Amino acid sequence: MDWELYLNYFGDIMPLTLLVGIIYGIVIHYKNKDTYRWRKICSVLFVCYITALIQLVLFLDIMRGFSYLLIHHMDSGNINGYFHFSGAYNFNVNFWSHIDSEKIGNIIIFLPFGILYPLHSEKISYKRTLLMGFLLTSSIEILQPFIDRSFDLNDIILNTAGVFISATVFFVIKKLILNGKIEYA
């Protein structure tokens, strides 16, 4: 997949992502008065990330259709007949056969999860972050055949690798800061 295409997709998913983020931000601002401001900001960013991720990997055709409708005031044809089972699946683990932008994208798209998930709550551990990242990517892959996309075991492995990389870096830096090895301004 081309990087320019990802940037176009970004524009398609932003309206709903921002709307969900604003509504969630207002709710947690009034609901959790004693929570630190930076924790609230991290929670809003996490919710925005999850909203964007779900739109991008599960509902991109629908979101592109709505985006087209908003801009051009006409149906793009992307929404009709969307929900049906494709039956496409791939259980072959072959992500090293050739590295392309789609495989790199599968890692990159889950890098924010390993950082934002533990930042939105104090009590989230490294193991829990990895587990939740794996469960999220597995759930997304399991749902894909129901929306005319394919299940691919490589995606689960690469997405989980993205969570592993970012969570490892995050928790190592966090431990160094807490032990006084790195000064935090």
Please name every model-derived segment.
Residues 151, 155-157:
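Loop-to-transmembrane alpha-helix initiation sites
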